[in-house]
């Protein structure tokens, strides 16, 4: 870091060190290479602008910067066809007299006439000249110059800058063009053109990202997605020969609007004689003198076969989240074409999973998904819980000048539709899963270990370490509607001298029919579970059972009575005291302890103190479905909701199922690890 007090002095010294006109007069001389080293070929390199130097210089940022500042490529001025051109900013370089004398002294003792070294140098020079003489080099340079000048208060008189995501769209388009038009010189041209974009420190591996066959952009509303696509396509057609571009929109009027905008742009800035238009099929053909024509085809997703049989090098899919799903196969088919790239661009509508499918690409092996929003993942929870927050607090937010975001806009839009501010205006691409992700309390590594590391409860070692008491929780449901809640049961055994527990049994039981025998059916299911566990685990001597009585206290007592009669093991029940009579009934009223039980369960999972048994018992879950996987599905759905009184509530109900089995396992684990509850014999009174 340069101290601010010394900055002016250093700038003055730098200014004095630069000889007047020195940089303008300096140029590369190809016929006098500098032979700096006599090392073996493996330890040296031929630099086209210097000579033979040690290979370690390939990592020298100073050398790279100096060579690029005097590269003849950047001295060539290609005039733009339209608008006002932009100069490529090049960092000036200078060699002081002292440095020049030191360099000559280092090279003075080395023979400059080494034939082998001269051959290596000549080869490097020829390679450099070939890349500059590449037939598509000037064509691609013209495209960049024209696009830069078009965006310099020509396309929009109020602006000469673009947003970062718009620049990235240009990069994906331009660098893919390099890879298909000059594949052999692609890496060299990558290095040359990255100076145009200011990507001085970007390595070659990062640049390979732009050669991907597909990329996805999720960008908030009104941020200039279609605007920049129109500019790119217009300059592609008029600057690059033999390029075939496709544009697909989700609605016909959008495709027609883009089609008309591109036509007007070309007619305004380029000769009309070069343009050939077929409005009936949305095609534009542009032909420059002595060049092959380039074409554009605009289509909609409603005619899913409209782009079949076409050849596109670049296919832009606008508002891709809203494309009809039966049109996707014809679009994705272009990924099989070697020289084709699909660019999906869409706003975010995460209120509906069907119009948020592009966000699923966040798990792709390649870095395909680019999301623009105003909230980072670390602060999404703060954003959701605090009503006054409208942007991420962790960094200085960049908001385009044409975008207004404040608390009043948030309140107004959310009055129209709850969550509209987050999903539509803020561009929160993860909002479809925000409720799940924000409240996600169990880590994926913990679930993987819970699933894979199962305890062999049948081994003598495990049996010696397990307590002989089985804890069973029954959450009864008196309905035969399989779409609604069923009876959940969870059985847990604790380990001796440890906080560890093992889940040994789960049930999710639905009544076959609504009769007066529902209590008998539920009790029979619980008795069958205890019998199976007693058979597999002979060390279990008794069962401590808690039967939830929130739905029906009479039925809960009936279940306890029937289970007491049918259980193969001695059974003790958790009792609830009647405040009026003082009588204790064999049932449990679930209340505020549920949150504490969930917290204990979540902590046990994340700390790996809760496991499942290899021989886990379930008589009701399908044989084709692993009971542990069935339980993990419900664990993943656990959500923590803050309440107005400062407390929290836990729930795992989701659209695809209920949380009955999970609640039973959570409560069984809670009773197995807590010393606050006393289990007593059936119907024992105070």
Swiss-Prot record:
One of its GO terms (biological process) is chromosome organization. One of its GO terms (cellular component) is host cell nucleus. Component of the molecular motor that translocates viral genomic DNA in empty capsid during DNA packaging. Forms a tripartite terminase complex together with TRM1 and TRM2 in the host cytoplasm. Once the complex reaches the host nucleus, it interacts with the capsid portal vertex. This portal forms a ring in which genomic DNA is translocated into the capsid. TRM3 carries an RNase H-like nuclease activity that plays an important role for the cleavage of concatemeric viral DNA into unit length genomes. HAMAP family: HSV_TRM3. This is Tripartite terminase subunit 3. It comes from the Viruses. The keyword Hydrolase applies. The active site is at 319 (for atpase activity), 475 (for nuclease activity), 548 (for nuclease activity), 660 (for nuclease activity). It is found in: Host nucleus.
């Amino acid at each position: 870091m340069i101290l601010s007090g010394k900055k002016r002095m250093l700038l003055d010294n730098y200014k004095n060190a630069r000889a007047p006109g020195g940089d303008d007069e300096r140029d590369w001389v190809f016929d006098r290479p500098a032979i700096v080293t006599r090392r073996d070929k493996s330890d040296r390199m031929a630099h086209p602008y210097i000579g033979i130097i040690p290979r370690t210089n390939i990592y020298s940022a100073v050398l790279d910067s100096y060579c690029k500042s005097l590269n003849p490529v950047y001295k060539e001025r290609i005039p733009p066809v339209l608008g006002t051109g932009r100069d490529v900013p090049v960092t000036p370089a200078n060699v002081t007299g002292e440095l020049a004398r030191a360099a000559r002294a280092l090279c003075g003792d080395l023979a400059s006439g080494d034939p082998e070294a001269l051959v290596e140098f000549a080869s490097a020079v020829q390679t450099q000249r070939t890349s500059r003489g590449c037939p598509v080099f000037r064509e691609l340079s013209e495209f960049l110059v024209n696009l830069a000048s078009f965006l310099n208060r020509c396309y929009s008189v109020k602006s000469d800058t673009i947003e970062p995501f718009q620049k990235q769209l240009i990069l994906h388009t331009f660098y893919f063009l390099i890879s298909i038009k000059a594949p052999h010189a692609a890496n060299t041209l990558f290095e040359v053109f990255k100076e145009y974009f200011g990507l001085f420190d970007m390595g070659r591996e990062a640049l390979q990202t732009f050669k991907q066959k597909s990329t996805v952009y999720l960008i908030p509303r009104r941020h200039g997605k279609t605007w920049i696509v129109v500019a790119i396509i217009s300059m592609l057609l008029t600057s690059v020969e033999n390029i075939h571009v496709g544009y697909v929109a989700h609605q016909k009027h959008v495709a027609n609007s883009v089609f008309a905008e591109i036509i007007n742009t070309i007619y305004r800035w380029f000769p009309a004689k070069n343009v050939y238009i077929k409005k009936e099929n949305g095609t534009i053909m542009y032909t420059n003198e002595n060049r092959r024509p380039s074409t554009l085809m605009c289509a909609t997703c409603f005619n899913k076969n409209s782009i079949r049989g076409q050849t596109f090098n670049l296919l832009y899919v606008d508002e891709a989240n809203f494309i009809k799903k039966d049109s996707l196969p014809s679009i994705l088919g272009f990924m099989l074409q070697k020289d084709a790239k699909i660019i999906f661009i869409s706003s975010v509508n995460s209120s509906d999973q069907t119009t948020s499918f592009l966000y699923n690409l966040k798990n792709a092996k390649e870095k395909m998904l680019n999301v623009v929003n105003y909230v980072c993942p670390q602060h999404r929870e703060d954003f959701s819980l605090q009503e006054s927050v409208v942007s991420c607090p962790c960094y200085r937010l960049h908001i385009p000048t044409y975008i207004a975001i404040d608390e009043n806009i948030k309140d107004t839009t959310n009055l129209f539709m709850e969550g509209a501010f987050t999903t539509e205006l803020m561009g929160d691409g993860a909002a479809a899963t925000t409720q799940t992700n924000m409240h996600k309390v169990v880590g994926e590594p913990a679930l993987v270990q819970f699933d894979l590391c199962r305890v062999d409860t049948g081994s003598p070692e495990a049996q010696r370490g397990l307590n002989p008491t089985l804890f069973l929780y029954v959450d009864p449901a008196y309905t035969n509607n399989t779409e609604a809640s069923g009876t959940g049961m969870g059985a847990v055994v604790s380990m001796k001298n440890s906080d560890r527990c093992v889940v040994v049994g789960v049930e999710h039981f639905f009544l076959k029919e609504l009769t007066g025998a529902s209590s008998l059916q539920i009790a029979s299911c619980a008795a069958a579970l205890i019998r199976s566990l007693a058979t597999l685990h002979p060390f279990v001597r008794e069962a401590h059972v808690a039967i939830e009585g929130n739905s029906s206290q009479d039925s809960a007592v009936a279940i306890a009575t029937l289970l007491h009669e049918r259980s193969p093991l001695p059974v003790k029940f958790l009792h609830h005291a009647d405040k009026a009579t003082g009588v204790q009934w064999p049932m449990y009223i679930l209340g505020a302890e549920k949150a504490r039980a969930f917290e204990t369960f979540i902590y046990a999972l994340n700390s790996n103190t809760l496991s499942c048994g290899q021989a886990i018992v379930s008589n009701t879950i399908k044989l084709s479905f692993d009971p542990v996987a069935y339980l993990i599905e419900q664990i993943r759905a656990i959500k923590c909701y803050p309440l107005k009184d400062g407390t929290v509530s836990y729930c795992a109900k989701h659209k695809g199922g209920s949380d009955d089995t999970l609640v039973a396992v959570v409560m069984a684990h809670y009773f197995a690890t807590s010393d606050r509850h006393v289990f007593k014999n059936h119907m024992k009174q105070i």
